[in-house]
Amino acid sequence: MKLYDTIVIGAGAAGLFYGALSEPGTDSLIIDHSERPGLKLLISGSGQCNITHDGSIKDFITRYGQNGRYIRSALYGANNLSLVEFLNKNGIKTVTRDDGKIFPESLKASEILNMLIKKSEANGFPLLIKEHITDISSDDSDGTYIVKTENSSFKTKKLVIAAGGMSYPKTGSDGSLYPLIEKLGIQMIPVRPALVPIYTHSYGYRNLSGISFKAVLVRLLENNREIAAQTGDILLTHRAFSGPAILDISRYADKGHKLEINYIYPVTGQRAADMIKADFQGNSRELHTYISRIFKIPDAFAVKLIENAGICPYMKTSCTEGDEITKIAEALTCHRYAVSGTGSFSEAMVTAGGVSLDAVNLRNMESKKHSNLFFIGEVLDIDGDTGGFNLQFAYSSAMAAVKNKK
């Protein structure tokens, strides 16, 4: 049986970064069970590939939830500037949007994917696709690993697992390698969908799908105690709340929590009430038109929001009572929705859970239990916010494994 220097399992972003970042001259292999490599990378950023985010790397730590502090060494060792420099050196110019998101100048994810494949192959990491892995074992006699597929067996000195999670299963990210990882005695954290819509009881905005709000404040509460807060854009879909602020906070959401939204942040409830009162006396406009105008919100949403407050949106503004003004102000700034659940893996952008960070030396991503066994990217228990943070970790963790500093 041929002995490879390195076998990478997974031809997603992390696996391809590993091949592309490695020194040339190796006799290695990247194996994937999908029909095409990098399918999830191709759809990232709606096909435009939001590859990373602008700003100081120290600010990235908070963008990975509670586990962010544990990957500090990986992020600092290969930061966002390093990633942009790597792309530039390989012929890909980048552009930074006003919101800090960084994209290839072409706005084509395929440009980055093609470069990573070409670079990996040039470095000695050809791709073997449509190979479903059935077993992974370690050979204690010589410290190597044997990877079995439905069609063949492969032996390698070093094994890098970059198999992703369970989000977007149609792209091949289906969690099928988890049982084989557990068989190696690696501690796993139960997985759950992350960066998903939040569903609520009596949602009520089905007919307003597509309406969005910028820079709102979103809070999650449990027994009236705040457990998470996020500012950013939100989107109303036909079934749930979505958009960056919702997706980022969804990792903390659970059935029974309350989702509180201030649609006109930073305006407070009291300030909103004062603004309504400022010109309502003698005002003959219909209430929904008045509210829509002064708070610059879509009229259709104003109608529904006022109805949700138990008030007729078509009454004359001048007929509004004081308690009704208070209810409208509260609906705008602190309305609470009962969370019924979050999106499934088919809706998730990433996977929370996976290989426990306690099972890995986070300086080089090597297993603490098995030498020369590495885990990189989404297969680890790391899920970042929207905005390029997950692809940044794919790069940073791959670089840490390539450098292999003990």
Report each predicted region and the residues it spans.
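An anion/pyrophosphate-binding glycine-rich loop and adjacent beta-alpha core
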Residues: 35-37, 42-43, 52, 57-58, ...
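Beta1/beta-strand and adjacent pyrophosphate-binding region of the FAD-binding site
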Residues: 1-12
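A glycine-rich dinucleotide-binding beta-alpha-beta segment and adjacent secondary-structure elements
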Residues: 129, 304-383
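Glycine-rich active-site loop/strand segments that organize a redox cofactor
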Residues: 48-96
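Glycine-rich FAD pyrophosphate-binding loop
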Residues: 7, 23-46
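Core beta-strand elements of the Rossmann-like FAD/NAD(P) dinucleotide-binding domain
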Residues: 2-4, 149-158, 229-231
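A conserved short coil-to-beta-strand element within the FAD-binding core of flavoproteins
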Residues: 129-143
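Short hydrophobic core segments
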Residues: 7-9, 31, 133, 154-170, ...
